[in-house]
Amino acid sequence: FGELETSNKCVGWVKDHLALDEIGVFLKRYGNATDSLEQVEFNMYDYLEEVIDPIPAGSNGVIFTPWLHGNRCPFEDPNAAGMFFNIRLNVGKTELIRAVVEGICFHMRWMLERQELKTTKYQKSKTVRFCGGGALGETTCQILADILQRDVVVVESPQNIGAVGAAACIAVGMG
């Protein structure tokens, strides 16, 4: 229904600026020195899932806008910027991390709502198929389901679905 071109960059920003030290501790506890880079990335997402799960919905009032490189959908605004709102003295890193995930999910809801306004001839689906790296986390899937108020179904091999689609387009193009 749309794309948020910086959702993975938002998570990368969290990793680099909010959680790098904690992720190192987590990897020492659960990781292995021989893990591949891909496995380390999965472990990083496991860490993020672990720390945001106990934070209540709404991130204790913290709101994040996920536009680290402008906004492209549903409205184009190259000057839009990512921001945190409602930061108070009692807000910790985990609330900020969950707010990033919620901000991404609320943006997905915004795109879906705009798409549904444009396509009135189709019945509103009660199910949304989720792909990409975020679909690997149960907590992230539940946050998306709660925000969309729909069932979320994770596609098979969600982190690779873009490459599969590109390969299918190439195959069709080549005959």
Could you say what each language-model-derived stretch is?
Residues 172-175:
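Cytochrome P450 heme-binding "Cys pocket" and the immediately downstream C-terminal segment
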Residues 51-164:
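Activation-segment/catalytic-loop signature of the eukaryotic protein kinase fold
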